[in-house]
Amino acid sequence: MSAKEKFTSISPAEFFKRNPELAGFSNPARAMYQALRELVENALDATDVHEILPSIKVIIERTSQEKEIYRLTVEDNGIGIPPHVVPDAFGRVLYSSKYVLRQTRGMYGLGVKAAVLYSQMYQDKPIEITTAPLNSKRIYSFKLKIDVTKNEPIIYERGSVNNDTGYHGTSVSMYILGDWMRAKSRVYEYIKRTYIITPYAEFYFKDPEGNVVLYPRLTNKMPVPPKEVKPHPYGVDIELLKNMISRQKEDTTVKEFLVKEFQSVGEKTALSVIEMAGLDPDKRVQKLTDDQLSKLVDAMKNFPDFRPPSPEALSTIGADLIELGLKQTFNPEYVGAVTRRPKAYQGHPFIVEVGLAYGGDIQPSEEPTVLRYANKIPLIYDEKSDVVWKVVEEIDWKRYGIEDEQLPLVVMVHLCSTKVPYKSAGKESIADVEEIEKEIRNGIMEASRSLKTFMTEKRKEEEARKRLLTYLKYIPELARSLSIFVTDGKKELAPKVQEEIQNKMIDLVVTKLNIKDKDLELFKSYRVETL
């Protein structure tokens, strides 16, 4: 090693400023989409997680003609942010309210801060935040940047005004270098896919070209919000254990620690785990050596009688809301959805939901349209590297009654978990975890069985329709023969009588057999000329 070689450390902010692609900010188009996504997800977490019907306003404005600098504004009606938290929430990387065992859209305390770092790289204006917590008598405003070297906020302005209207929520504006023409389709697709699974929300979206799109609220029914839960013993490691122990009182025993800090652990279970680890249950937990901690972790991971992790930390969308969103967006001939039972991997609970839509306004293609979601986040990029796509590709749709080479089919998959195994900090694709892959496959197969029943009934109806129309071909001939009989061969009267008989028979058949308009038009084409 050279004697002149120097070693140094950098802050988390400096690291992500140097490597923005790790957080999804790899180019102006992707960065524009990613920044908008981070702001919208924070807005939704501030509303539906707290049982507030979301009203989200999204505005993108171009502010410079020389460079493609855009002002992104996202406003919500959520719980707001306490003013003393705002600087760190937007100006300190890896600072977050989401480091708890509860399902949230965000995970790392990174997203919006990565957007702020990207914003600072190409223009000088700070991020602007206006917020009012629930029942706050003041509305607070901030302008700030991130000190990259120190990983702390630089506050340029702060202030407050009276809140005379009872307003609560948050508005965030940031300026970024973007590429609207390349990002446009992704941004619109993101908002559409978000709306599919949040039909209880209303969105106002205005793009840089002045186009305004309104997404109305379709229902007031909301998913049950997640609850914060204790860690499960199967998900523990030595570092997590040390961190938890550091927050205990000095006289806390090993048994008390296990019972108080972990789910699925009562006194009897705690004593069994401690016995497996060869420890004294009355020993102070802060006095455990590294070797003893290692034995305790091994015992916790290998104890066979823990209950599965609690699903209370999860919030599913629900089959009803999935079906409502798919119907509104695709106007399908068939729609169905299932919510699977909770499962677990590495001590973390997860639930898979699957929705299928077929026919109607769905455009046929060689492959199904796949909508991927994780913790209610639409995943737009990196589709083919996702485990969901891998499973969908392996499904033989002919087994479920879809014989066409061109598939008018939408497959929607939602994974919710306290720990989604993303492949990167950009949160765009789910890793191939065996337990999750198996459950996604089972979920699609379960949903597809209902689709198969529909396709079977549809095929029977089509075959019955063909037989019926074959029989209906003879009605005009029958009407003509009857008209000759009724008029006693008087040709001048026969045409009128034939028309009357034929119309009455049509009305009778249409009423009794519930023939649809398209079939009626086909039937009318079988009429023969009157005498």
UniProtKB/Swiss-Prot annotation:
It is an enzyme of class 5 (isomerase). The keyword DNA-binding applies. SMART domains: HATPase_c (SM00387). GO terms for biological process: DNA topological change. Keywords: ATP-binding, DNA-binding, Isomerase, Nucleotide-binding, Topoisomerase. One of its GO terms (molecular function) is DNA binding. ATP binds at residues 42, 76, 97-98, 106-113, 427. It catalyses: ATP-dependent breakage, passage and rejoining of double-stranded DNA. Pfam families: HATPase_c (PF02518), Topo-VIb_trans (PF09239). It comes from the Archaea. Its EC number is 5.6.2.2. The keyword rRNA processing does not apply. Homodimer. Heterotetramer of two Top6A and two Top6B chains. Relaxes both positive and negative superturns and exhibits a strong decatenase activity. Belongs to the TOP6B family. This is Type 2 DNA topoisomerase 6 subunit B. It comes from Metallosphaera sedula (strain ATCC 51363 / DSM 5348 / JCM 9185 / NBRC 15509 / TH2).
